[in-house]
Amino acid sequence: MTESEGLVTFKDVAIDFTQEEWKQLDPTQRNLYRNVMLENYNNLITVGPPLTKPEVIFKLEQEEEPCVVEREVLWRPCPGEILGIDEHQKIQDGQVFEGIVVTSEASECPEEFASTFFPNADSIPSMHSLFECDGVGECLEPNFGDDDVQYPLPEEQFEYDDAMQPFHTSSPHFVLTPFKCNHCGKGFSQTLDLIRHLRVHTGGKLYECHQCGKGFSHKEKLINHHKLHSREQCYECSECGKTFIKMSNLIRHQRIHTGEKPYVCQECGKSFGQKSNLIDHEKIHTGEKPYKCNECGKSFSQKQSLVAHQKVHTGEKPYACNECGKAFPRVASLALHMRGHTGEKPYKCDKCGKAFSQFSMLIIHVRVHTGEKPYECGECGKAFSQSSALTVHIRSHTGEKPYECKECRKSFSHKKNFITHQKIHTREKPYGCNECGKAFIQMSNLVRHQRIHTGEKPYLCKECGKAFSQKSNLIAHEKIHSGEKPYECNECGKAFSQKQNFITHQKVHTGEKPYDCNKCGKAFSQIASLTLHLRSHTGEKPYECEKCGKAFSQCSLLNLHMRSHTGEKPYVCNECGKAFSQRTSLIVHMRGHTGEKPYECNKCGKAFSQSSSLTIHIRGHTGEKPFDCSNCGKAFSQISSLTLHMRKHTGEKPYVCIECGKAFSQKSHLVRHQRIHTH
């Protein structure tokens, strides 16, 4: 390991002066020197092993003058024009001033050097080590680059040819860079530049914001930071009015409006509005991930991603929301969160006008219009519009489920499903309906629920025009037209159009019923079935008919009931043309044409076309009568028989003749009565 790669020592970050140099510093510069030296020393003893206090630190603490040293001066070739002289001329008459070699015949060019290095020169308070070359005719800037070659001049004569051989020239000029960093070897022409540079090694941040306490190593960065507090924003976008502290930020922002993407990837041709985004993108092709976390070994292609990741280990969340107090590890995350409070959506789709709070969300949305799906699965070729969707899809091939619930050990391939699942254990339902007060675990469930109240059905079937309140219902419905049943049971060969129905069916073979009723102990294969069952205990009927006020425990029952008001009968028999309001009624009716009777009694062998008919028949063998009249105690084997019996007690006669107005308690009695009018 080289010295520049190792630990920083006090020698690396110390700055020394000659007696003459110290005299050239004004009180402000001396004070800055004292502060930086003491700060560098304190930084080193804070993060490193104990140090013996150097003499210079003792003197600075006592506000005495520091030590005086001799200095070796670094030279580099002048970037100006080269003056020609005899290439075999030697430098003679070597002279030493304050440890610096000076020659009287080094070149034909008269230089003027700072009195910092030549006691007989005029004083230069700014301490610039520039010199003026009459041969070139201009003042040369100091050397700040890492790539410039530097030459230490020894205190002895040397061959001019040997010194300048790499440049193939006869008369170079030199620029002084006498202030050298002991840690990395970089040279500087001014003391203050070296002082600023040393903060890179020590982590020193001399400039502190009085508003928030944040420290900065450069004054310019502190000035820019102050503008965040003062909201001093000078550069305004003429398109949207957004303002920026820096002109460069405005220029980048305006590319959102113009669509300009000047930075193009040479590998795939993708273009970007910012050069930094192109650099990050190119790492996808190279696979380069140079930033590694020391805690867990995870690597990142961007330094900022590593910095953000490290806060996961430390738990640091320094950016807090003023509205709700929620804290974030990154200021960008806080900025996006704030738009949730303000409702700001600055990114608008040119096609449909939909607005978004994040630019990335707009890009994803635009792919809905263009149909672009740039992320393709290497296994099956399926393409996706989002990288995250591809990542999740790949888990269906690998079987990976990285999100595990600590409560029940259930694993999930989607983080979103994992978060939703955790709310089952906490019973957290943060999203409440303003109409009926019902609460939901997910916001999306609340949105779907509210469509019951509003009657909104935004998803329309292109084949028959039928509308649905949920997209999943539309997708399931469209399979009726296509006849598609992609999910086939390996046990019995039965196929299903929906994956959920297939999963539920498989539990018939396994006998799995993981959901138990706390009231009666009855078990169910689906949580939805348990939810519906619990309503039989609670009597809850949340779905109410707007026409007659009748309430139902299931939304599907309400939908069926509504057809009694509308007269809708969407299920038509292909054999005889008879229509039905329920699909199950059509299936039972079709068995009348086919003669199919799939439900057979184990006792007597009698077969039935309906499961409910077999259940009632079996009660004839067992004598079971589970439906009791609460008034007289009479029991019945069928609930329909109990319903008819109850009308004797209540006097209810719901079936009315439209001809004469006579009412009946049973529908069959009304049908028989209506024959009087027809004959």
Curated annotation (Swiss-Prot):
Look up the domain of life of the source.
Eukaryota
The alphabetized list of GO BP terms reads: regulation of DNA-templated transcription
The subcellular location is:
Nucleus
GO molecular function per UniProt: DNA binding; zinc ion binding
Q: What are the boundaries of the C2H2-type zinc fingers?
A: 179-201, 207-229, 235-257, 263-285, 291-313, 319-341, 347-369, 375-397, 403-425, 431-453, 459-481, 487-509, 515-537, 543-565, 571-593, 599-621, 627-649, 655-677
Please give an example of a GO cellular component term from this record.
nucleus
UniProt key word DNA-binding:
yes
The UniProt keyword set, sorted, is: DNA-binding, Metal-binding, Nucleus, Repeat, Transcription, Transcription regulation, Zinc, Zinc-finger
Q: Which InterPro entries match?
A: KRAB, KRAB_dom_sf, Znf_C2H2_sf, Znf_C2H2_type
Domain annotation KRAB: ranges:
8-79
- Which SMART domains did the record assign? KRAB (SM00349), ZnF_C2H2 (SM00355)
Family recorded in the similarity comment:
Belongs to the krueppel C2H2-type zinc-finger protein family.
Q: What does this protein do?
A: May be involved in transcriptional regulation.
Protein name as catalogued: Zinc finger protein 569
